[in-house]
């Protein structure tokens, strides 16, 4: 499918962004509704959030001609995190400082540090996938079952 550069590609990207934001926003709304004692409303927000997640997945898969592989996803995630900490949040922090909003600038800088750690983690995981070290290691290792904890 030839989407590159089309208005439809832009529409798919906007649809993906909108559905993704709605998914997360409705999770926040669900949490607040439940804290306020509105369990049924919270559950409705959770259900709708799951719906929005699936809608986002439709648009994502069309944009990427299916679901990319794990190595490709790790590289994409690492590159995205790199952009966030080196460019996006650095720029946001600078703007906030210029506007006298030092507390917000500090928050941007703090999140940038977390994004840097995310990038490093994704790059280590990608190296493990590429080197065949996800399920095996040299020497003695302790493995823990992610289901039962044993």
Question: Which residues fall in each region the model found?
Answer:
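Non-heme di-metal
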Residues: 1-150
